[in-house]
Amino acid sequence: MLPATFKLCAGISYRHMRNMTGLRKNAMIAIHHELNKLSGPGASTWINHIRRRSSLLSSPIAEETYSEADQCYVQQGQEALQKSISILEDQDGWQTEIESINGEKVMSKVLPGIGKVFKLEVTLEQQTGDLYDELVDNMEQMGEWNPNVKQVKILQKIGQETMITHEISAETPGNVVGPRDFVNVRHAKRRGSTCFLAGMSTQHPGMPEQKGFVRAENGPTCIVMRPSADDPNKTKFTWLLSLDLKGWIPKTVINRVLSQTQVDFVNHLRDRMASGGGIDAAIAC
């Protein structure tokens, strides 16, 4: 029997977790169903690009042996991607929160069962592959360039696409929102020229709640990166963010903090890429 900790990881039955191939197949069928909905009239061009060039289902399913707990994490990551795609394909109901002179646009909407979610859209000067390498391969270095993050630590890797992370956020100016920590399952995919980094909160035996931090909840979240239609050397960057910061914080404060956090993140990412920090670190290793 799975420990209670892992039963909380995903709302799936023990019998379903016994077969990894079936589990991944069912999750991918669900993703394929979402992509099918996006292929009709008015579908966004980037989803059509994914389907045309290299769909999420195009690669063969590797025969990998995972523990039951690891299977649970893999399914959670795939579920985060599936839910995020479903949210992003629905263009109705988004309200503008921020529109900056640098091109960042943050929008929000309220979803049943999830709450308020935020979507940032911007075009970045860097190539998609370079951004993916920085955000995925150099994930643990994020605290070096993003002052809103104190630490990112990879607790466990499962195959090539799934990992469990522990992240500590910094307090906001004036300590309006104190330090939070998160335990997330992350699911990273590169399909054709489009890259995904999806995630959601989970539990891990190696990281119980920590003294001095409020354990916040995250997800579904997803960063989608693809070459710009106007210039393939630039990247169309879309970030879906859903957070429950916990604690007694007014909603107006939460909304302001989260939308501004997205804009700040993009600006810090620009600075990081311009400095070549991630590339320099890779060469030094």
From Swiss-Prot:
Single Gene Ontology BP annotation: regulation of steroid biosynthetic process
Q: Which coarse location class applies to the principal site listed for this UniProt protein?
A: mitochondrion
* Function, as annotated: Plays a key role in steroid hormone synthesis by enhancing the metabolism of cholesterol into pregnenolone. Mediates the transfer of cholesterol from the outer mitochondrial membrane to the inner mitochondrial membrane where it is cleaved to pregnenolone.
Q: In which pathway does it act?
A: Steroid metabolism; cholesterol metabolism
What PANTHER family has UniProt attached to this entry? STEROIDOGENIC ACUTE REGULATORY PROTEIN, MITOCHONDRIAL
Organism, scientific name: Danio rerio (Zebrafish)
Q: Which GO terms describe its molecular function?
A: cholesterol binding; cholesterol transfer activity
SUPFAM superfamilies noted in UniProt? Bet v1-like
* Gene Ontology CC, one term: mitochondrion
| Subcellular location(s) of the protein | Mitochondrion
Q: Keyword annotations for this protein?
A: Lipid transport, Lipid-binding, Mitochondrion, Steroidogenesis, Transit peptide, Transport
Q: What reaction gets catalysed by this protein?
A: cholesterol(in) = cholesterol(out)
Q: Where is the START domain?
A: 65-278
Q: How does it assemble?
A: May interact with TSPO.
For whether the record's keyword set contains Metal-binding, the answer is no
Q: Which Pfam family name is an example for this entry? A: START
Q: In which tissues is it expressed?
A: Highly expressed in the testis and at lower levels in the ovary, kidney and head.
Transit peptide location: 1-61
What is the recorded name of this protein? Steroidogenic acute regulatory protein, mitochondrial
